[in-house]
Every structure is written in C-alpha cells, then in structure tokens.
C-alpha cells in the first residue's frame, strides 16, 4: 500500500510523536492532522508555530514546572537542550531510513512538516498553563474517556463490601511494577497494610511478594469505571496523563510516583492544583507514603479541589470527542486547513527570533560606538596638543 500511489485518502491522521509518518503525506497528497495522545512536544509546537518557552510554557517532558529556583531553571534549560539534540539525531536518522525505503525523491522531514494542517492535543489547556496557540491547534483533553459502565460482579461486590473504603494502586501499562526494586515495593506494602483501608493493586504477576490480607491484586481492571465507585478513597499512580484524566473525571485525589516520560510534568500539576501529593521514587519510604495517605484521606480539601478542577475542565459547549469530530470533518470539507497555519509554523528558530535583524542592529550599534570612540579619541588628542602648544607659547 505504501508504494501504491493510486490509493486516495481524504485525510491522514497520525500520532504526533511519530514524525516519520509525514512521509505518507507526500505519497498520498492528503491533508494531515497530527494527534498527540499525550501533551505537547517542542517539535509538534514548532511545526504549527505555537508558542514554546522552556520556563513559562514548558512541554510535557519537563520535570519541574512551578516555583523554579535558579538551579531548577538551569536544569530545565539543559533538559530542553538535551531533548532537542536527541530529536535532531532522530530526524536525521529517519531521513536516511525514509530515503532507503521510498527513494531519494522523498523530501526531508523538515520540508514534510509543512504538510501538517492541524494538531490535536489530548490535554486540557489548564494542564498546559494556558499556552497561546494558533487556531489549528485543538485541545481535546479527555478524548479517551468513556461513559460509565457497570463493574464486573466480583469487583463490585468487593468494593461495596469494603467497610472503610479502598485505595487503588496502578502504575499504568508502560511500567512493570514487578521490576521495581523490592525494597520500594515493600515500602508501599508496609505503608498501605497499616491503614484501615482495603487495597486494590493492578499487578501483572500471579503473586505479590509480601502481600498482606488487606491487599487484593488483579492483572486487569476497568480503571475509569473503578475510579468512579464511591468507595475509592485514593489513587496511587505513576502519573500518566490518561490515568490522571480518569481520576479527575471521577473526583479522586492522587498520590503520584513519577518514573518516566511526562509523569513528572503531570505530578507537578497535582501539587500545584492541590489535588494530590508527589513522592519521589528515588527517596521513597514507608514513612513518606504513610504520611501522604493520611494527609489525603483526612483532608477533604484534596477531593474538593479535584471536583472543582473537573468542573473547570469539563464546563465546555461540546465534548472533546465532538470537538475532534467537528474539526476532522472541517479539514476534510476544505481539503486541508493551511489557512489556519501561523506565520511562524515550521520556521527555524534563527528566523523566528530574527537573529539576522538583531545582528545588523548589534553591528550598527558597535559601528556607531566604535566611530564615537575614534572621534572622541581624536578630539582628546587634539585638545591635548592644543593645550601643550599654548603652554609652550606662554613659556616662550
């Protein structure tokens, strides 16, 4: 299919992180909508000309967002630089691979980026610090959420019968909890075993070493429906975006233990919006977990803040799915949406910052300053000579 140019498509929908897929836009000559299943990345924002600032409007791979110290700012700037270097090498290698597959006639990715008509971001604007974006960037946060369904009978019975409530633990699909250091797993077990709550833990193995009677494990759980159950007191999570959305929609406070990707970014927002507590996996301990559980379960403000944030996020004239469908049909109706692209779209940073103009201004100022120094130096020497001449005349 990839080499069959007779194929016709009205629209191409790509995962935004898979930049090499833009080669298909050249082959099939169809409009492109990039869909980011996470938040924004520097590369995606640059393609559409959206504002990006590593400190004011950080992208989702930044680990520190609020209350930055001077050292934090340097660290985040270096983080941004490192990510861009990795991405540049990836783009270079991707160009080589695409040339081998499709031949030398395939344009480089830096040109193919101009074929992007629209960007869908599966994140809420408030989670992006209300980043200014052009009209072809559409926020569809919570797109993956589904209407509530009945829980399976055994799970519903377990939750309904809990006397004091249930703590739910899941580290998502990209983290295998069984591979965590045993002492960290044991710290979690020790902390939750000392609470009056039942514990439901998504665990991919047949047995959890050191499991106490109040802990129930399961390899798969309908998370979004589970979180909506009124007996859920708290969600201990790795901080993934989809898990975060589901917890907010269910009104459940969180304890975040970030481990990779955008998880630090998301957990930073837990703390800022006062909907949860962050625990660093490098310094995790039974005492820290116990304190976090006690704080959240005894302080109703965390749950109230989640409910308030949910109201702010979802008080919109249409759902994320309806918005995504409308704009998808819009792009198809108009055979693209190039008219919505910002002037800065896919513009190199040196052009975006007008470094050529800045260099001319700096050179002009340096020329004026240099000329002024030369003139003043000449005048100074001239005055000195005149003064010396007058003294000589008077002495004679």
PLM region spans:
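Short loop/helix-cap segments at secondary-structure boundaries that form the rim of catalytic
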Residues: 22-27, 43-46, 127-135, 206-214, ...
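A donor-sugar binding/catalytic signature common to diverse glycosyltransferases
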Residues: 12-14, 219-266
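Conserved catalytic-core segment of nucleotide-activated headgroup transferases in glycan assembly
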Residues: 114-115, 129-216, 221-223
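Conserved nucleotide-sugar donor-interacting segment of glycosyltransferase catalytic cores
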Residues: 1-66, 125-127
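C-terminal amphipathic helix plus adjacent low-complexity
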Residues: 101, 111-112, 119-120, 286-396
